[in-house]
Amino acid sequence: KTYDVENYPLRALVCEALGHEDLENLHKHYTYEPFTMENNSNTELHDRFYDKLRSGWSAFHDTYDLFVKEVIVPIYGSRDFIYQTLPTFRVHLVGNWAVPEFHCDSQPGYNHPEGEINIQIAVTDMFGTNATWSESVPGLGDFAPIEMNQGEFTVWDGGKLNHGNMIND
């Protein structure tokens, strides 16, 4: 599914938070040993994004809320639902992974509730080893990348589908 990048300038907002325009080349500025489950979001990039988000960054919060209201809600009609106030931010640098284990979000340790859906929004092109890999049916193990271009999003069941990342080459 696509979204209007002019109405919902999520990439531009991420660039603002990180202080970088060329998201595809962040690996030229930041290098880390391969992440573990304990440190996969302990980077300067995550700190910049979440610090800005927690500061009351109205440009992002307003855009994100509008995206949910105008793009996501129509998919579900009038059905009531709640959504994550602070979205999860993933950085998938070359030579690393975003999350270093395959998992289902509802499994112990991840603790996401039953019935939760995932909406992944691409602010860069996602393909091959820089994409999230997921099985198509719970337990099937037929992993394939969820490929998207910047300006696209996908809705999927990360609570039931085993998914993760490859080392981004």
Model-found features: residue ranges?
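N-terminal auxiliary "cap/dimerization" subdomain that precedes the catalytic jelly-roll/cupin core
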Residues: 1-75
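Conserved active-site beta-strand-loop modules that form the wall/rim of enzyme catalytic pockets
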Residues: 115-121, 125-133, 144-146, 152-153
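Glycine-rich, often proline-containing surface loops adjacent to acidic residues and nearby aromatics
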Residues: 42-55, 83-84, 116, 130-132, ...
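Short helix/strand-bridging catalytic loops that position acidic/His residues to coordinate divalent metals
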Residues: 104-108, 134-144
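Conserved double-stranded beta-helix
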Residues: 69-127
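Conserved aromatic-histidine-acidic binding/catalytic patches
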Residues: 52-60, 107, 111, 146
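Catalytic core of Fe(II)/2-oxoglutarate
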Residues: 138-169
